[in-house]
A protein has these predicted regions:
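Short, positively charged and aromatic/hydrophobic N-terminal segments
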Residues: 6, 14-15
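Bacterial N-terminal signal peptides
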Residues: 27-36
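Bacterial signal peptide processing site
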Residues: 39-43
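Post-signal peptide N-terminal segment of mature Sec-exported envelope proteins
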Residues: 46-93
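Lipolytic serine-hydrolase domain surface
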Residues: 80-220, 240-299, 316-330, 335-434
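The conserved beta1-alpha1 loop
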Residues: 227-231, 335
Length: 434
């Protein structure tokens, strides 16, 4: 009853926040309106169907999904169309003295973090392109299109798949936004000039993958890599799109990577996602170990969101248990959907020291975590306010006052102030003020 009430309340609130014309259309079609919560991202039109190729033969290891025609990419093209971002709201408040510094609105650092694309975000006359390397334990569907290449099933015959994808970022991209087709704008197909979309996909063998990652990272100024791990209710394309958006908005000059586990990309599949998250722990653990041992990357930054923080923290603990000495630079837990007591008593002691800096973002406006807390019956680590957990050895950032999304769960990559916070932490290597 609680979930049903919350479900319809969210839809009503969603409609009320629409423009008048869109609100009228949405009201007329309310029975069939599908809400993609901020736990995940709405898949593109080509990826809406769930595993239509389930059971199909696994594609050949070395494949390239077709790409739409891309314009010539003149070297050195600048980014003239960046959207001007309004003056920011007050920065996130901190509950601990050791917290990430946020410049004031009047400082030079208060500008858009995407004023210019990084060298890894190549520009064309019509859109930017970000290269994302990925590891996944999702089963290939048998389809050749990039949006449909991986589905929601576990890939038990491997299990890991590797590859790289080019992702478009519009010239007029807004910081914190994954631009997608909007039905109320009568957009029913993807356009790289307007949307963050997968342009192509190339699968790689394991050795070729880590060699390519090493080569790519060696070309960057500081030999760094940024790994993103998504949470509940996220499709493979959405995970890659979010990775590209974060890397672009952070002006990250290193290698962008994503680890995508088999989330069902469905609100009603929470328990299935939980099982798949736990199943993915050893695969992520091995991926992190290989990333350290098979490359010469100097610094690895990891951002995990929601249920993905369970996969990450348990993977780090498993690597320690197996005798691997992982050394990461930043580990960022965004809105962690983890039992707070389990984290404090069982996980943190095992992962202490694995990263130079461990940071958590929390919000008491996080409706998704409130629902998770109702389901589990215990406090969630990522709830702020009265639920906020300040733990020795971890910086805690209270993001309650700055999130304006429907469920208050996607602020880690969608709010400009948090993006700027991550910029200071990951790219500028600023220590938290003491």
């Amino acid at each position: 009853m609680v979930k049903a009430t919350l479900f319809f309340a969210m839809r009503i609130r969603y409609i009320l926040r629409m423009p008048p014309v869109a609100r009228l259309l949405a009201s007329a079609t309310f029975p069939v309106l599908v809400l993609f919560s901020s736990c995940g991202e709405a898949p593109g039109p080509a990826s809406a169907a769930k595993d239509p190729g389930a059971g199909a033969d696994t594609p050949e290891p070395a494949t390239t999904a077709p790409a739409p025609p891309k314009p010539e990419s003149p070297a050195g093209t600048s980014s003239p169309g960046q959207t001007t971002v309004p003056a920011p709201a007050p920065p996130p408040s901190r509950y601990r003295p050791r917290s990430i510094g946020t410049p004031s609105a009047g400082s030079t650092e208060a500008r858009s973090v995407a004023d210019a694309p990084s060298p890894e975000a190549k520009s064309s006359k019509e859109y930017h392109t970000v290269e994302v390397f990925y590891g996944t334990n999702r089963k290939p569907t048998g389809f050749r299109e990039a949006n449909e290449f991986y589905g929601t099933e576990r890939h038990r015959e491997g299990p890991m798949q590797y590859g790289k994808i080019h992702v478009s970022i519009p010239l007029h991209h807004t910081v914190g936004v994954v631009e997608r087709p909007k039905w109320y704008k009568l957009e029913f197909s993807e356009d790289p000039k307007k949307h963050v979309m997968l342009l192509d996909l190339e699968t790689l063998g394991k050795d070729a993958f880590f060699e390519a990652v090493d080569t790519k990272t060696a070309e960057s100024p500081e030999h760094e890599a940024l790994l993103f791990i998504h949470g509940f209710n996220v499709s493979f394309p959405s995970a890659i799109q979010r990775t590209a958006q974060i890397a672009f908005d952070l002006d990250f000059h290193g290698t962008a990577l994503a680890f995508s586990w088999p989330s069902q990309a469905a609100l009603e599949a929470y328990t299935v996602d939980q099982d798949n998250a736990i199943w993915s722990v050893p695969h992520l653990s091995r991926f992190l170990v290989d990333l350290q041992e098979k490359t010469d990357i100097d610094a690895i930054h990891v951002i995990a969101h929601s249920m993905g923080t369970r996969v990450l923290t348990q993977a780090l603990a498993q690597a320690r248990d197996e005798g691997f000495d992982l050394k990461l630079n930043n580990v960022i837990l965004a809105a962690p959907d983890i039992d707070a007591d389990v984290f404090r008593e069982q996980i943190l002691p095992k992962i202490s020291g694995v990263a130079d800096r461990l940071t958590m973002y929390a919000s008491s406006s996080d409706t998704a975590l409130k629902l998770s807390q109702t389901i589990h019956g215990n406090d969630r680590l990522g709830l702020g306010g009265t639920f906020l957990k300040t733990i020795e050895g971890m910086d805690t950032v209270n993001a309650t006052d700055i999130d304006t999304s429907l469920l208050g769960h996607a602020y880690y990559g969608s709010h400009r102030l948090v993006v700027r916070d991550l910029l200071n932490l990951v790219v500028r290597h600023l220590d938290p003020p003491r």
